[in-house]
């Protein structure tokens, strides 16, 4: 059995399960989304990993992809290997993706920062693939911007207190 991804997401590269990496941060005020990128596999690849030649593209708050994607060679790409312009793509049910990540973070509150790998299924609904509690990856900042944003001082203080 395997997950069938959304037609929209599959059109970007049908050979891999293309996933969203959503990074959330939990503090006393609640859960905040720090960054979101879409990871798209290299043409013919079965994985969407950046390290295996895939690309990633930042996602705007409305669910549309930013117009530029990045691969591990440092190339700036405006379309996928299937010819889809990144700026023309919108993630289905993007608001639900954020809601899902936020609600799941409360289940594991002992981790302050979590990276969620989420796919969009054939019914355009988010599905959790896995979550990562360390090594969030500095790479995604290339596409999404500074990871900690307005929380940088707060997060750095947590790091200082733990050492």
Can you describe what each PLM-predicted range is?
Residues 1-69:
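Phosphate-binding site of ATP-dependent enzymes
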Residues 77-96, 102, 106-111, 120-163:
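C-terminal active-site "lid" helix and adjoining low-complexity regulatory extension at the edge
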Residues 115:
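Flexible, glycine/charged-enriched surface loops at secondary-structure junctions
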């Amino acid at each position: 059995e395997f997950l069938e991804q959304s037609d929209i997401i599959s059109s970007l590269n049908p050979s891999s399960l293309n996933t969203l990496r959503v990074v959330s941060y939990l503090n006393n005020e609640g859960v905040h989304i720090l960054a979101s990128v879409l990871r798209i596999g290299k043409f013919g690849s079965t994985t969407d990993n950046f390290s295996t030649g895939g690309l990633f593209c930042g996602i705007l708050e409305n669910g549309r992809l930013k117009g530029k994607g990045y691969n591990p060679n440092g190339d700036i790409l405006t379309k996928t290997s299937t010819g889809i312009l990144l700026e023309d793509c919108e993630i289905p049910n993007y608001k639900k993706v954020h809601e899902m990540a936020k609600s799941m973070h409360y289940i594991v509150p002992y981790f302050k920062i979590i990276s969620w790998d989420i796919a969009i299924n054939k019914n355009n609904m988010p599905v959790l693939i896995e979550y990562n509690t360390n090594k969030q990856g500095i790479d995604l900042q290339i596409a999404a911007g500074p990871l900690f944003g307005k929380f940088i001082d707060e997060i750095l203080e947590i790091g200082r207190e733990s050492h």
